[in-house]
Amino acid sequence: PKSFWSMKKLSSLFSLFLLIPLFAVASEVGDRTIPAEVAQLADSLKQKFAPDKRVALFDVDYSFSGKNVMLRGVTTSAEAKTALLDGLAKKGYAVMDCLQVLPDEAGLEGKTYGIVNVSVCNLRVAPDFSSEMMTQGLMGMPVRVLQRDGWYRIQTPDNYIAWVHRVGIHPVTREELTAWNNAEKIVVTSHYGFVYSQPSQASQTVSDVAAGNRLKWEGTKGAFYKVAYPDGRQGYISKSISMPEKKWRATLKQDAASIIATAHSMMGIPYLWAGTSSKGVDCSGFMRTVLFMHDIIIPRDASQQAYVGEHIDIAPDFSNLQPGDLIFFGRKATPERKERVVHVGMYIGNKRFIHSQGDVRVNSFSPDDELFDEYNLGRLLFATRVLPYINKEASLNTTETNPFYSM
């Protein structure tokens, strides 16, 4: 009878209203101290699914009221969330689940990908211009869009996760990204330049460009290529500072001598924390930028770059090193503390190395050299050889094999 179902409905609603205050109390004034058994579960899941917060998220906020717990926050791993819910249930907890798995497909309205739409976009820890910069993205770079909160939380082809202002990227669907990836492009080969509204350097500029930028190739007019931006804007770029991508790849060299020559071309470019472009670089950003100009994608930070390629122990006379090896510096291991990588450069031969420290410069490990760097010699740790391992390791690839560029 209708009256029976009405009473049942009222009973269910009454139960729900009883439950809501319980979680409201947990949310507002509840105990945020995590019980040891839950902390142990959370730590084990974080180590398994998101050991490096730069490339994976497991940010969970817990509010407890006895054996009731409210979960909030975000994670990039659906498996981690499932394991957390199962683990809490086994420990006897009643869970109100508000933990969000990224990407937020509903909030993003299906546009879970994006393309960098400015010459160099700044990626930050939090969605605010005053927040610390983490890394940068280059025009034409495909990204995964995870979340929107005024800004966009994105993941770059080296898997770095950070926030970017909405102007920095053009959000797209997977199909639109595939169309962009498959389109013929023009690659910027000069460290800096401009796109113009007409095929003339006397015309209005559309935007600046930096080395490694990619634009869609729309045609040719005299000494200019006609190009299109990810958002559809059009303009003209001089042939003297750019090249069709296919031609660029055909003439590309990935040997040590060519890469070192590119590194030398950036001499004097200022140090910029989190910089990964020809406008400014930090130490690992310098390595990433130089290699990317040769279509090599490596992890973002020095502490990540230290684990790609072949580990090389540096002999006292440096005879184990080859030009093009990455060399790492930092705190040496002691019985009390682990080794910690904080700086990286590239070995160029004859006991010299090139790196970004203040600006891009060359220094030496030899006390007899006028470029001797006693400070960095004292904190030298080891080297890695990456060039023979391109496309042989998951985190050492090219734009032809990286998953972001091949969708």
Residue ranges, per PLM feature:
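Aromatic- and glycine-rich peptidoglycan recognition patches
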Residues: 171-174, 193, 200-203, 243, ...
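SH3/SH3-like beta-barrel fold
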Residues: 140, 152-156, 164, 212, ...
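Boundary regions of SH3-family modules and the immediately adjacent low-complexity/disordered segments
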Residues: 82, 86-107, 156-187, 200, ...
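Beta-loop motif signature
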Residues: 116-139, 188-217, 271
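Active-site nucleophilic cysteine motif
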Residues: 263, 275-294
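...with weaker cross-activation on analogous glycine-rich loops/strands in unrelated enzymes
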Residues: 298-362, 368
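N-terminal targeting leaders
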Residues: 13-19, 26-70, 74-136, 141, ...
